[in-house]
Each structure stands twice: as structure tokens, then as C-alpha cells.
Amino acid sequence: MTKAPVAPVVLVILDGWGYCEETRGNAIAAAKTPVMESLWTAYPHTLIHTSGKAVGLPEGQMGNSEVGHLNIGAGRVVPQELVRISDAVEDGSILSNSALVKICQEVRNRNGKLHLVGLCSEGGVHSHITHLFGLLDLAKEQRISEVCIHAITDGRDTAPTDGINAISALEDYINHVGIGRIVTVSGRYYAMDRDRRWDRVQRAYDVMTQDGVGDGRKAVDVLQASYAEGVNDEFIVPVRIAPGTVEPGDGVIFFNFRPDRSRQLTQAFVSPEFTGFARQQIKPLSFVTFTQYDSDLSVSVAFEPQNLTNILGEVIANQGLNQFRTAETEKYAHVTYFFNGGLEEPFAGEDRELVSSPMVATYDKAPAMSATAVTDTAIAAIQKGIYSLIVINYANPDMVGHTGQIEPTIKAIETVDRCLGRLLEGVSKAGGTTIITADHGNAEYMLDEAGNSWTAHTTNPVPLILVEGEKVKIPGYGTNVELRSDGKLADIAPTILDILQLPQPPEMTGRSLLQPAEYEVELSRTPIPVGLN
């Protein structure tokens, strides 16, 4: 007997598509988006919060893709690593952190150097410079004789030239605490690649590991010289400015807390079977990462991962239902690893498909990215008729928005809008329901108040639109579904469970965005478990 095809819930995450009524510097407002505009007019919609305490960050802190997908998938507000580590610095408990104290002892016993590696930024997305200050306090208390700082500059989650302020603050703190020196400087474009562009990573790695006394400049001089040549923080070419090579017997603390852009450089240091580029592994080398970048890495972890249970993917799997995730390279980890609460392995019945991002230096050169291929992949999954939940991420608004180039970002937005129209046709034919939303803002605010380019995320809310399939009514809510106006990302998973008529576990503390209504239900839809993959 042939089983009826499943009418799926399709969650579409428009990465970096925020909401802002101001039109100046707003690539979304400037773009032609007939699909999104018609959906906003015709279907239930609301705005939801994606920053600050609504996603487990400090008040006023902008959200990001990792935090956004983690909250969406968990169905609860997840306290973020930024808060956990900042609290440890503020209350002094970082000074007694067992992994950090141990590496200091090992370095001291071997008479080695302690290397502090990470993004020197106040962005709070991958790191925070106050965490580096806490490590300098630790090194002083542990009587480390030589502390070498390998500064990575931001310019992506901060203004393009904010790095000089961060580096100046770091120099001031070094003078205050009386320990440490900046020995290398590298833009995150090189040191924090996540797309296996190993030639970039190698340039940062070589500067850190090859012998040399440096050119004697101060770090702020390096930045000023780069700015004069039109090269901003993100793209600072790796350079050594003082002695302090990573050598056998040394220790490294990588103080980024976000894993995705920290894995590759870490692999270059510690993976015995590393093949990204030719290098001689440094042994012995003590290595601590602030958080768990990858469970397969041979490192110590200062702040162990939080254990999240009964997240959305797990609930779907435990019900015997199938699910599908797809995104292009830039956001694939977000719809898989982060969406699943930091778990690498898929749940039972969870299929995934990676679409390769175009190999370009920056995405303003290819604003369409791989959105068409992502759409094709999603439609093919819908047509299989076996998935109860399909999760899709369109990377364009965020990745092109980060370049600060408005015209290419407009093209990126328009590409996504066209793809969305085609995707919705596929969902409609399958009788499915689509939730369209975003993980954080970006492309809606690309100029600051002074008219300068803004390349970071925003604290703006994001849209959420609920699109029911034709002749398919959400059980219990009837034809005139309304959405709450005070929602947050943690409410999306309960909303999906509500639509699928699945029980919400107690660990999932978000609330469905669907407003109860007193209507006659014309046609209910119950998901049908299908054991085909």
C-alpha cells in the first residue's frame, strides 16, 4: 500500500534580512521584492526579536547566525557563550578555570611561551576583547614570563576601521597589567576562513609559526598603513611585528568562543593528519580553545558545551518523522550543527545536502551566490514527499551585506525574492506550510548615521510570515490565523510543533506564535511518518 505524501512544514531562513522603516542605506527597501511584499500583505505576519536578552545575549548586543540558529532549533532562549565567559571574567572565576590554569602550568614548567590567539574586537559575535584582558590577568597571576598576542582584526562584525580602537585599548591594557606584547596582526579574512580556502589560513599560520623578529612596527601603525592603502580591518595582510614564534614547548589559547571560523586554524596547529597545506606539526604544544570547536580536535576546552535536550530536530526524530536541511557552504553549519544545539551527527531520519558557495574573494562579486541551487535542492526534497520538516537558509542578504556594498546587496535580495517565489510554488503543490523569517538583521542597515559603510549585524527585528498551502488549514486555528507581536526566535520551534500537532516538551520554553481562534477547521493535516530516505 502506497503511503500518502507528507505535507511538510518548510522553514525558510533569510539570513540577515532585518526590518527597518528607514530607507536610507536599506538594501531591502531599495530592492524589488514583489514576492515578499505580496506575502507580507496577504498572509499572517509579525516581527520577532533576534538580539539581546531575547536570544541569550547581553542587552543591546546584536544577534548573529550562530546564536540565531541555536535559538531557533532549541525552542528556548539559550544563554550564550559571550555571557558565560564575560561573567567568568567579571567575577574572577576565569582565574581558576581548570583548563586555563593547567596550560599555564605546562608552559611554565617547560619554560615556554604562552600565545593568545583570537579576534580583537568588541563585536561580541566571535569573541570579545575583554576576554583577552581576562587572559592577561590570568597570565600575570600564573607568573608566565612571555605572553605573545596574535591579534586578528575584525571589520565585519564591527565598523571597517574599528580595529584601531580595539588594538589601542589592548595596548593600554598591556601597559596597565604589565604583561604581554602583540607579535602578529592578521585580518579575519585570512585567520578565520571557514570555507577551506587554505591558502588564506596558511598565510596567517606561517606568520605565527615561522622564525622572525618582525618589522618592529606597532600594531596601530600596521592598521594605519593598511587604511591608507584602502585595506580595512577584515583584510589586513598577516604580518609579524615582534619576536614570538609558536614553537615546541609553547602553549596556545584560542579565545574565540564561536567555533565555525576558529576550526581551520586550530586544525592546522593540532590535527596530526592535516592536509590543508604543507606544514610540520609543532610538538609538544599545549592547546586550549575557549569552547568546543570540534569534538574530534585534540585540544582542551575551557568552557564546555551546554547540553541541550529535546530540541526541534530531536523531537521530530523521536516522533519517527523525517526532516531535511540544506544551505550553501557559508551557512550549512548553521542549519545543521548550530540548529542541532552543537551536535555534529544528524538525528535519525535527518537528511542534509550541502550546496557549494561560489569561490570568489568577496560575495559582492557574485551576489546571487548559490541561491538558485539551494532552491533546486529544496524543491527536490519537497517533491520526495517524505519530509515533515524542511529547513532552508538563504545566505545572500547576510554574506553580501557584510561587504558593505549596497548595489550588490540589492541584487542579492532580489535573487532571494525570485527564488522564494519558485520555492513557494513547490510547497503549495505539496500542500505544505511555509514559515519565512530571518536569524538577525544586516542588509536593512548598511550606512551609519554619518553615512559611513556599516558591515555588521543589527539589533533590528526581523519579519516572520506564515504561508498556508491552498485548501490546507492549520489544525485548531481555522482560516484566519493570527500571529503574536511579541515573539522571538525561540518561539519558532513551538510554532512548528503546533502546526504539526506534536507535543511541546517541557525543556522547550518558547511559545507558539499562533493565536488561538474560534473557527471551524475545514481540513486538518496530520504528518504521516514515512520511513523512506
Curated annotation (Swiss-Prot):
E.C. number: 5.4.2.12
Catalytic-site annotation from UniProt: S65
UniProt entry tagged with the keyword Repeat: no
Catalytic reaction equation(s): (2R)-2-phosphoglycerate = (2R)-3-phosphoglycerate
GO MF annotation terms: manganese ion binding; phosphoglycerate mutase activity
Entry GO CC: cytosol
Pfam families: iPGM_N, Metalloenzyme
Annotated binding of Mn(2+) 1, by residue: D398, H402, H457
Cysteines engaged in disulfide bonds, as pairs: none
Primary role: Catalyzes the interconversion of 2-phosphoglycerate and 3-phosphoglycerate.
Family: Belongs to the BPG-independent phosphoglycerate mutase family.
Protein name: 2,3-bisphosphoglycerate-independent phosphoglycerate mutase
Protein source organism: Nostoc sp. (strain PCC 7120 / SAG 25.82 / UTEX 2576)
Organism lineage string: Bacteria, Bacillati, Cyanobacteriota, Cyanophyceae, Nostocales
